A protein has these predicted regions:
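A short, charged, and often flexible helix/loop element on the N-terminal side
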Residues: 55-86, 138-139
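Glycine-rich phosphate-binding loop signature in dinucleotide/nucleotide-binding domains
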Residues: 88-94
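Short His-centered aromatic/hydrophobic patch
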Residues: 100-105, 124
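A short, histidine- and acid-enriched strand-loop-helix "catalytic/donor-clamping" loop
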Residues: 123-140
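Membrane-proximal helix-turn-helix segments that form the acceptor-binding/catalytic region
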Residues: 128, 140-153
Length: 153
């Protein structure tokens, strides 16, 4: 099976637990005979592409047009992830499944699903309501609603 992992963090970029989960899951899936491609954010002096013991890792820039607004930053990242996924599909063919890791990649995952008919598996590693003991402001409501949108797909 050809699996596309979408995540905003993958080693060496580790923000929380997502990077470790995606890394370990990808390695296990390779061991089980699957093809795994990861598209993630490029931070610092890391290559745009690497083969991490069988896991093909593609990193994309984020141009940070408005770095003070995290939601805008995430949307820009989703556009760049989507562009890279489209490029890979054009070159290598369609993926069998997309595994979207958390709300941060919702829009690229949803667009790929709708454009190519690729099913989505989604993992919300920590819900917004759980992290904050409820939803208390509009920013949290936006993240909560985006989590719902991803898991509804």
């Amino acid at each position: 099976m050809k699996i596309l992992m979408l995540t905003w963090e993958y080693p060496p970029r580790i923000v929380g637990g997502i990077a470790r989960v995606v890394h370990d899951l990808s390695k296990r899936l390779i061991k089980d005979g699957h093809e795994v491609t990861v598209i993630t954010y490029k931070e610092g002096n890391v290559p745009y592409y690497e083969n991490d013991k069988g896991v093909e890792v593609y990193r994309v820039d984020n141009y940070m047009i408005n770095p003070n607004n995290f939601i805008d930053w995430i949307m820009q990242l989703n556009f760049n992830m989507l562009a890279k996924a489209n490029e890979l599909i054009d070159k290598k063919g369609k993926f069998d499944v997309i595994h979207a890791h958390d709300w941060l990649v919702t829009y690229s995952a949803k667009t790929l699903k709708n454009s190519y008919g690729i099913p989505i598996v989604s993992t919300i590693h920590a819900t917004e309501a759980g992290r904050n003991s409820g939803i208390h402001d509009e920013g949290q409501r936006y993240v909560n609603d985006t989590e719902w949108l991803l898991t509804y797909e």
